[in-house]
């Protein structure tokens, strides 16, 4: 399609190796053939299985790859659904080449694990965050996190008991050059709570600071 060609041309101009797929099934096959792929761009309206289902299937076996969903500006629920199925970010159509490239750049760096801290681990019972291999355990059990979820956990565990605004979290996790909306913070934290909280309806680890942001409850 024309939008796919537009994306491929601009990402190749930015220096990326790009693999194309016309359908959801083809995308999954090509990811199996190219397991070191760092970032996937998924249009929701794919022929065959849609972008949501492709995202779910990718996340079932791969938490490292960065996933960006392409959505229509008017479809707010599509953005939330995409993030809740495992996407790290979304870009609304129409978008500029600069915006898309900036989003891909940010996820590409994170998916490559470039930001590796000097210290080895952060322990706040029942959690253990290993900053060398970028993993999280709760009561000794590994919790599968995406790269964005890991980055959010790291921000919280480095700032125990401190109220962090949505803007601060956005800057620390997505970077100051991020073009998107604050909503992405809320949805990713909602997804993270599903993985770490004992009772999602009454969270005790990531608590909401109403009208401001969130706090790691230690």
Language-model regions, residue ranges each:
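Charged docking surfaces used in two-component/phosphorelay signaling
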Residues: 5-13
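The short loop immediately C-terminal to the conserved phospho-acceptor aspartate in CheY-like receiver
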Residues: 44-45, 73
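Hydrophobic residue at a beta-alpha junction
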Residues: 21-22, 46-49, 77
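DNA-binding patch around the recognition helix
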Residues: 114-115, 119-121, 144, 189, ...
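Short, Lys/Arg-enriched segments at the junction into DNA-binding effector domains
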Residues: 105-163, 167
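Acidic, metal-coordinating helix/loop segments flanking the phosphotransfer/catalytic sites
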Residues: 20-39
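Basic, amphipathic DNA-recognition helix from helix-turn-helix-like DNA-binding domains
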Residues: 56, 60-123
